[in-house]
Amino acid sequence: MQAKSFSLGAQEYLLEAVAVRCGDDLTVVIGGGEKQHIGAVAVGVPRPSLKDKNIVSSSASVLCLTGHKEDLLARKAALELVRMLGHTVTVLSLIHISEPTR
């Protein structure tokens, strides 16, 4: 497995991501905030576009823990990465920012 780390932002708004290649597939863990914990996970899979079967599109399944709001981030990231890579992608979101102001 190959892994690569990324970061964006600063202080309480610092987000970090680790991407791990799992054969042809990809797993991404995105975390940040005061107390990281699992909030949502999305699994994106490639499929032919409904408009043009020669174009790769994607579908996603999402699990979001009660009270968490990371499902939109996990889903969007999974769908975009599947379109770019053409392989299955999982995105795990571990973000917790209390009362964000920006």
Task: Please give the residue ranges for each predicted region.
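N-terminal, charge-rich interaction modules
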Residues: M1-Q36, A40
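A contiguous, well-structured "functional interface" segment within a domain
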Residues: M1-S7, K69, L73, V91
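A residue-level signal for beta-strand positions that form part of recognition/binding surfaces
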Residues: D25-T27, T88, P100
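A short beta-strand motif that forms part of the nucleic acid-binding face
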Residues: G32, V43, I95
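Short, internal acidic amphipathic alpha-helical interface segments
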Residues: V41-G86
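Glycine- and acidic-rich phosphate- and metal-coordinating loops
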Residues: T88-I95
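Residue-level detector of conserved catalytic or cofactor/ligand-binding positions
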Residues: I95-T101
